[in-house]
From Swiss-Prot:
Organism of this sequence: Methanothrix thermoacetophila (strain DSM 6194 / JCM 14653 / NBRC 101360 / PT)
SUPFAM superfamilies given in the database record: Translation proteins SH3-like domain
One GO process term, biological-process aspect: translation
GO molecular function: rRNA binding; structural constituent of ribosome
Cited Pfam families: KOW, Ribosomal_L26
Keywords: Ribonucleoprotein, Ribosomal protein, RNA-binding, rRNA-binding
HAMAP family, alphabetized: Ribosomal_uL24_A
Subunit structure: Part of the 50S ribosomal subunit.
Name of the protein this chain belongs to: Large ribosomal subunit protein uL24
GO cellular component terms, semicolon-separated: large ribosomal subunit
Membership in a protein family: Belongs to the universal ribosomal protein uL24 family.
Superkingdom of the source species: Archaea
Keyword DNA-binding: no
Known function: One of two assembly initiator proteins, it binds directly to the 5'-end of the 23S rRNA, where it nucleates assembly of the 50S subunit.
Gene giving rise to this polypeptide: rpl24
Length: 116
């Protein structure tokens, strides 16, 4: 049986192996995609187009540049911070704070998932 204790839930997420962390990397689908594929959420993948829903960059839409399973964050084109020396660095965003607006279905396995 899995524990109900919050500390053990947090520890399980923190110590989860990478193949389990993929399940934490889901984001909601836009209403149009939801109707089309009859799914509420999907795993975020590099190449998807997402819209930021929360935070300072809410409303910004861009392509997913990278997915970091180790830190459970994604980077989106157009969402960045500036360092003190003026260089631009991508700002990490948690996938729960974005909405997928366009799926990258180049992968045959992923296309199979959505055609079920």
């Amino acid at each position: 049986m899995v524990s109900k204790q919050p500390r053990k839930q947090r520890k399980a997420r923190f110590n989860a192996p990478l193949h389990m962390r993929q399940r934490f990397m889901h984001a909601m689908l836009s209403p149009e995609l939801r109707k089309e594929y009859k799914k509420r959420s999907a795993q975020v993948k590099k190449g998807d187009t997402v819209k930021v829903m929360r935070g300072d960059n809410a409303g910004v839409e861009g392509e997913v540049l990278s997915v970091d399973l180790k830190r459970c964050v994604i980077t989106v084109a157009g969402v960045s911070n500036f360092r003190a020396d003026g260089t631009e660095v991508p700002r990490p965003i948690h996938p729960s704070n974005v909405m997928i607006t366009k799926l990258d279905l180049d992968d045959d396995e992923r296309e199979k998932i959505f055609s079920r």
